[in-house]
Design a protein with these regions (language model features):
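P-loop NTP-binding core
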Residues: 1-266
């Protein structure tokens, strides 16, 4: 059965895109069939995969997630097969649906849509889902209708948290949205785990991890992601950390193994 996982945190700069990309590739390396979905108008995941330039503009005229959402609510030219929106990245051997800056208008064109919180869920057809073991959604740093769509479409959520000062900013509101979706729209939605990122050897980082252990005793990942320059280098080369021999790549592989174990025992 396909598991759909949202990588979400209202706070920006916590490693959502890096986590989505590298967890996805790590799962792929275990033999899982993986689809990445870029649900952020900044399109950082699409840039990581070489689909957009540094300004978030597509390098060609191929359709993106914003086109697909407009089709789903009847505002665009209808394409009969959702799979036409899927791209394959050869370098990382992974499928993805890209984003672009036009997704920034999503709140406007979703405002009048029927069941606007379920548009993404309806886009992920049974035929599409049956092709994958995992679908990973890279969410934007916001609490708007796009995040609601991601959560309603998902089975679970992973929250990356930067192990630095102000790490808990926005977590309360995200937890509130999570509880709201779980109570009213997606009862089976689960918190797969909280992932400390950008961990270093400072006392501040150690304090944040201790606070996370207290706040999420059962959900905190055993693995942490350390701060390292390799993350930026990997993005610039459009190649997952998991394809190099480095500490961060091994950490993301360990996170993927934890996800698989948690899904088995859930």
């Amino acid at each position: 059965m396909c598991r759909i996982i949202s990588i979400a945190n209202q706070k920006g700069g916590v490693g959502k895109t890096t986590t989505a990309m590298n967890v996805g590739v790590a799962l792929r390396l275990t033999g899982k069939r993986v689809l990445l979905i870029d649900l952020d108008p900044q399109a950082n995941l699409s840039t990581y995969l070489g689909f957009t330039n540094d300004e978030g503009e597509p390098i060609d005229d191929l359709p993106t997630i914003s086109h697909l959402m407009m089709v789903a609510i009847g505002q665009g030219k209808k394409l009969t097969d959702v799979k036409q929106y899927i791209r394959h990245n050869e370098l990382n051997d992974i499928d993805y649906i890209p984003s672009d800056i036009n997704l920034a208008n999503a709140d406007c064109y979703l405002a009048g849509a029927l069941s606007r919180e379920t548009v993404l869920k309806r886009m992920l057809t049974k035929e599409l889902i049956s092709d994958y073991d995992y679908i990973i959604i890279d969410c934007l740093p916001s609490l708007g209708v796009l995040l609601m769509n991601a959560l309603v479409a998902s089975n679970g959520i992973i929250i990356p948290v930067q192990a630095q000062k102000f790490a808990f900013d926005g977590l309360g509101m995200l937890n509130s949205i999570f509880d709201q979706v779980k109570a009213t729209l997606k009862p089976e939605l689960s918190l797969i785990g909280v992932l400390p990122t950008m961990v270093d050897h400072t006392n501040a980082s150690k304090r944040v991890i201790e606070q996370l252990k207290e706040a999420y005793p059962d959900e905190l990942f055993n693995t942490v992601i350390h701060r390292a320059t390799e993350a930026t280098e990997s993005t610039n080369k459009h190649r997952s950390l998991c394809l190099y021999k480095n500490r961060l790549g091994e950490e993301y592989k360990a996170v993927a193994e934890e996800i698989i174990r948690r899904e088995v025992t859930a």
